[in-house]
Amino acid sequence: MYTDERQKELIKLTYEFLKLDAKKLTKEEAKKIVEDLREVIRFHDWRYYVLAQPVISDYEYDKLFKLLKDIEGKYPELITPDSPTQRVPSEITKVFPQVKHLTPMLSLDNSYNEADLRDFDRRVRELTGLDKVEYSVEPKFDGAGISLIYEKDLFVRGATRGDGEVGEEITNNLKVIKTIPLSAKFSQYGIDKVEIRGEVLIRKDLFKKMNEERLEEGLPLFANPRNAAAGSIRLQDPSEVAKRNLEAFVYQITYAEKDGKNLLGTVLKKHSDNIKMLHELGFKTPYPVMKVCIGIEEVIQYCEEWQRKRDAYPYEIDGMVIKVNDISLYDKLGFTSHHPRWAIAFKFKARQATTKIINVVFQVGRTGAITPVAKLEPVEIGGVIVSSVSLINEDFIREKDIRIGDTVLVERAGDVIPYVVMVIKEARTGNEKPIEFPKTCPSCGSPIVKPPGEAVYRCVNINCPAQVIERLIHFASKDAMDIKGLSEATIRKFYNLKLVRTIPDIYRLDYNLIKNIPGFGPKSVENLKNAIEESKKRPLYRLIYGLGIRYVGEVTAKTLASAVRCIDDLKNFTITDLMKLPDIGYKVASEIYNFFHNQENLKMIEELRELRVKTCHEEEEKKGKLAGLNFVFTGTLKCCSREKAKEIVESLGGNVLDTVSKKVHYLVVGEEPGSKLQKAQKLGTVKIINEEEFLKLIGGENTE
């Protein structure tokens, strides 16, 4: 669609336009640039929606779009029917059948500060004649937009957003997403046919694990949860979609019919009530965190609150959505061709930025994997200064053609590691240098190899200092033995001082020596000693996970722990025996088998036992008071974190599951419970208990 030369011209124009302010442009100046500005925006739409290869950040795109809007607002005679402000960009690739939405699936107008929100409120009040407006405020999910249609209580069609008028029909793919009910009793609300809008998401922790597994296997990483979700719902095979841990949140009813009449604004009068109804029907919705605000000041306060706590939310959100709550006002407020006038998005700080690669260094991981890391010109992304980013492996570098000196688009989503989305090749000067992989380990100088079928180079020396340090860091980490005070920096310091060389050395530390190390006082040494002693009591699965067996994550570690009485029992398992355990294939089984048939590893486990680290289940733990019972949690607990509650249940022999099903024995309900409560009530087989009853059940276990 665009030649390389034209793309370079448009990139150059992009950065020129980003410096402009519509308020300072005369009509003649605006007239000269407006068509080029439209072309620049169309170009970026094409890069984003069709190629999925943006060359600017979302924030920069929004600035360009706002510049065009402001110019057209100042000089309406410059508006053309084909202007990007008059339509929604398309993402259709014609892989799936195209279907027309019942109502247009428009974008939202964006705001970035209090002034924008107050301006929105002023316009709403002027058009409605109200002194104070009631707004609903909810998180703006950063996922893949979908539209769902239910007829006579059955889910009959699902589609992507597409160009807003026409989307791609992906019903079969959406049917495998468990948070989309295949039927819902809309008829009890007098609704025959309904169209619902939503977003497909991947929870941040599951996305992180997905990328960690792909990184370990040398597969290309997903840039962010949104890209992973958008790509997943458009896979050709629904069974593959089902493996991706997708969830769907619905956030709006756009059409509700009874006897051919639309009930919105008459029978269904308030947006917040509609979301509550969807919530009660078993859909996943923002209802638990939605707030109805009277006046714009309450709205601003709630948006600021969420900007502070955004990273604590389980899903990636990029802002808040503010809607006029009274649906009967929507006709009066109306629409532009791009967005409704009764809603606006308040966007959080940008998560993407462009910067330059200064250099590339090579780091060695605990399994010997050698990872190239780009050192960047420091850049602020989402309130955090980013100065380095993993380049994954040689294949990733070659595929994206990354070079030292390149300008790159970097994204940092929530607690997800920074990621190079793409190289801005149009910004190259000719001075960029190819990245050369080392021939030997950068830590110990040993030869490096690239095993058949793998994308990563590995150091073959298991005593390589970098590998040893990374194994120690992993062992002490929160998800493993959780040794507070034994940070990465402390481990490196202890290693350099020759205080630790192996995992058992952690339990042989000379605390009298540590007292003399700068930065360690009597109190910090005492705290470290207590934390190390406490770690000896951790559940068996944490020890297995902490040993750093390749491909063995937390879930697989739990599977192994539940299959044995003591860790030594694992040396008696053949590869075939291991493959009979849930979710363990040949590759993982081979790594486990090799680990427990390595004499050095068996010697290490024996040393840990002699140092009184728990290597067996205690009988009461294996057959604890909660043995065989499955728990699910919903809402916020006062007594402790969800992670701590999970740890207690597992220490007493129980299991904690993510979703409600007939396998679940107890649903523990905290404050602001989600849709799991309705599902449990609907099933009728799950015992629903509150926090107080849960505490009685666990019988005085320490929740701190």
Curated annotation (Swiss-Prot):
GO terms for biological process: DNA repair; DNA replication. Its EC number is 6.5.1.2. The lineage of its organism: Bacteria, Pseudomonadati, Aquificota, Aquificia, Aquificales. Pfam families: BRCT (PF00533), DNA_ligase_aden (PF01653), DNA_ligase_OB (PF03120), DNA_ligase_ZBD (PF03119), HHH_2 (PF12826), HHH_5 (PF14520), Nlig-Ia (PF22745). This is DNA ligase. It comes from Sulfurihydrogenibium sp. (strain YO3AOP1). It catalyses: NAD(+) + (deoxyribonucleotide)n-3'-hydroxyl + 5'-phospho-(deoxyribonucleotide)m = (deoxyribonucleotide)n+m + AMP + beta-nicotinamide D-nucleotide. Residues 621-704 form the BRCT domain. NAD(+) binds at D58, Y59, E60, Y61, D62, S107, L108, E138, R161, E199, K323, K347. GO terms for cellular component: cytosol. The keyword Ligase applies.
